[in-house]
Every structure is written in C-alpha cells, then in structure tokens.
Amino acid sequence: MTTLTKIQVYPQVLEHRLFFRDPIRVGSRLTCRERSNRVYVHRCEKKVERKRKVEKFKGNGSWDSLKSGFLGFSKLGFLSKDEYNQKVENLEMVFSSVAVQIARYIVTMTSTGAILLIGFQLSGGDSSMNSLVWYSWLGGIIIGTMTGANMVLEDHYRAGPRNVVITGSTRGLGKALAREFLLSGDRVIVTSRSSESVDMTVKELEQNLKEIMSNASESARKKLSDAKVVGIACDVCKPEDVEKLSNFAVKELGSINIWINNAGTNKGFRPLLEFTEEDITQIVSTNLIGSILCTRGAMDVMSRQHSGGHIFNMDGAGSGGSSTPLTAVYGSTKCGLRQFHGSIVKESQKTNVGLHTASPGMVLTELLLSGSSIKNKQMFNIICELPETVARTLVPRMRVVKGSGKAVNYLTPPRILLAIVTSWLRRGRWFDDQGRALYAAEADRLRNWAENRTRLSLTDAMEMYTENTWVSVFSLSVVCAFIILQSTTPSSFPGT
C-alpha cells in the first residue's frame, strides 16, 4: 500500500478510536490495524506501560525517585519485561557502586581530618608546623589516590574468568586453591596421580559450586556462570603425563592463563639416615623434577598464546637457602627450585610468560603434619593456618599478577608480627597439649564454608578503606610524632 500521508498523534489523548477513510501510514509507536479502507489507531501500549513503570517508583523515597527520574528521560519503558528488569538491575549496581565510593571517601576525609586536627593542636599555632601538616595530608591523599587508581585499573584489566591448571590439587592447599579459583568464576583443571581422587574432587567442587550458586544473588550467579572444573590424572614426574596434561588443558579450556605447580611431597621430620632411597627419589622427583617439567610444559603452551600466561612455583622451607634440619631432602629441593626460578625468569624476559613464586607459609596439611612432634604442633598453633584461609588470600593476588618475577606471599611481615603479638591467645588453637587435633575435618569445615567466606577478617576490614586513607594517616602520624619530639626539650626529662 502506498503511503499518502504521515500523522503524529499523541497516545495520551486517544480515549476513543479514531477513524480515517483515506489510506494512511501511522508512526511506528502506534498500533495499527487496517480493515478495508480504514485504519484503527489505538493508544500506544508501550508508552502506557512505560508511564506505569515510572509511576511505580514515585513516592517511595529518594532512591526510587532517582530511578523514576532516570526512567522518565530514558527509553527503558519501551523494553520487554525481562530486558527492563535487567536494565534496572544494572542501574542499581551503578548507583550502589557510586554510593560505596562516596562513602569510602567520606571515611577517608573523616579519618585523616581527625589526625589533621590533632596535628594542628600539637603544632601550637606554629605556621611552619601547620604547613608541614597540610603538605603531609595532601601528599598522602595524592599518593594514596594514585596507588588506589592503579589497583583499580589492574583489576579491571584482568577482569573475566581465568583458565587455571593446578597440579596436586585433590587435597590440602591445592584443592583449596582450586575451590577458590572456581568460586571466583574461573575454569579450573585439577590433577593427581590417582584418577579416583581426581573424579571425587571434581564432583565435590561441582557440588560446592552448585550450593554457592543456589544461594547467590543474580549478579553473583552471572559471575559464576562461566565457572567450570574438570580433572585428569597426571604424575608430574613423567614427561608424557605432563604433555598429556597440557594438551588436555588446551582442549578443555582453549588456553591457559595460570599454571600452579603445587604438587609436592615430604616423608616426615627425621634425620637423613632414616630416609630410604625410595623416599629420597620420590621427594626429589616430585618437588624439583616435577616442577621443572611442568614449568617447561606450561611455557611451551603459553609462549604460543597471544595473551601469554603466568606460572607459579611454590616456595617452602629452605627456599631462601637456610638449613632445614630433619627435612634436609625437602629443603634442598625447595632451594634448588628457587635457583631454577631465578634462572628461568631471566631466560623468559623477552617473552609474554610470567614466572612467579607463591609462598603459603605453614598450612595445616598432611604434608606439614607428617612426622611432626608435639613440640612442632605447639608452634603450629601460632603460625599455621587452614588451607581455605591461605587460599582466600593467595588467589585474588594470583589472578591480577602482572609482569614476571613476582612473589605472592601469605606470611607477610604484618601477619608474622600479628601472630607473635597474639601468640598467647593462639595457644591450643589447632592442637592441645598432647598434640591432638582440635580443628574440624575438611568435610565438616566446608559445610559452613560459604557462610565463613562472607565474614570479615581484620585484614579484610583494613582493605575496605581506600589507599589514600592509610597513606595519609601514616604520613600525618609521622608528622605528629615529629612535632612531639620537636616540642620536647632536654629540660623536660628529670635529672637533666
């Protein structure tokens, strides 16, 4: 039918049908139906629906009023119900993110403002001291903001699921790392010598993922939608098994972003003469030769990838070259692995493959506890942690690592200092005076694992503050200490 004319009719005024005897074409926002020589023009249902959606948010507080205003000036009202709900959810996430950032900077200004007032009070009105306080505050804000911005950019740059391979990941720390990567939305391959152990671990991790997703919010489920876990049996001491693992990873995941050489073994705490030849061979083969073979296999795959990748070798007792009595063989493998790591980092400088170390510290695993004495276990109460705790700290740092030659450590100086200061309170934390375990088995711990993930630790609470808060508070505290020392004269001390 030929278009004779175009008309514009506002749907709000169409309380009754309008009839046109001449053939016409009506705008796309009107619903039309032609019968012989007539066109029936109805009210635009989409615009009516849009108006209804906007009205729904009115009168329900400032938050809903803000959404109402946004909807009124947008085209969200013309979307389908599902599209509309998705857009509104995204809008709420944006508003929430903005509100969080505003709250963080309010905390920054409040925290540093309190220190600022203390500094002015201590300066006694001295203009030079006041200037020093101001410059210290401003410098802290600038440096902290730059640091925070860099961290945000790094996190944004590395956003999205990773493809991760973890050797020795059917128990202990390896399984905890696999679980943490999986629940970060990543695709994970677990390995072990035993195919039965691999199958059991895959089923267990899949069940963990289902339980988390069943109770997660819509945004969390979207984040976990790409998560996947598969497994394959692999003896890292055998080159053919390592090659099979790398080929399997490429087939299942398409590429490898992170490869963690976690497979390791120890045969207890005892003098060298009590180790059998088989014990020595197995320790050296697994800890040193296995890590070298896996590093070579991972580098071969990653060097052919446009995005490259990152390889982590696990540090342990003896990595720094210190003596390790009663674990001489284990310590020598870790020391040798550190030498290998330093060499391979220099070899790969012109490639897109990053080589790093990860140090979990002392973790309550079978590897650590094998052959340990009661005295050892009393020490473990102070500095040891559960695998889940360590994995929760290491994985976020592994996911955003850049460059090469980085060290991702759990036992940082602040954590060591905190452990020493609170050592009295940590007595009997994991073992009693007789060396009997007081902590729950892994299966029991994981029943409440999802709930425990949401609880804030001291370090988690510290990380909620922006970087410029900590830098500013530190710099201002140093200035305040300087002012106090400057204002203290020798005559203030008795006997001088």
UniProtKB/Swiss-Prot annotation:
Residues 1-43 form a transit peptide. The active site is at Y330 (proton acceptor). It catalyses: 7(1)-hydroxychlorophyllide a + NAD(+) = chlorophyllide b + NADH + H(+); 7(1)-hydroxychlorophyllide a + NADP(+) = chlorophyllide b + NADPH + H(+). It holds the Pfam family adh_short. NAD(+) binds at residues 166-190. GO terms for cellular component: chloroplast; chloroplast thylakoid membrane. Keywords: Chlorophyll catabolism, Chloroplast, Coiled coil, Membrane, NAD, Oxidoreductase, Plastid, Thylakoid, Transit peptide, Transmembrane, Transmembrane helix. GO terms for molecular function: chlorophyll(ide) b reductase activity. It comes from the Eukaryota. It is found in: Plastid, Chloroplast thylakoid membrane. Its EC number is 1.1.1.294. Residues 195-224 form a coiled coil. Involved in chlorophyll b degradation. Belongs to the chlorophyll catabolic enzymes (CCEs). This is Probable chlorophyll(ide) b reductase NYC1, chloroplastic.
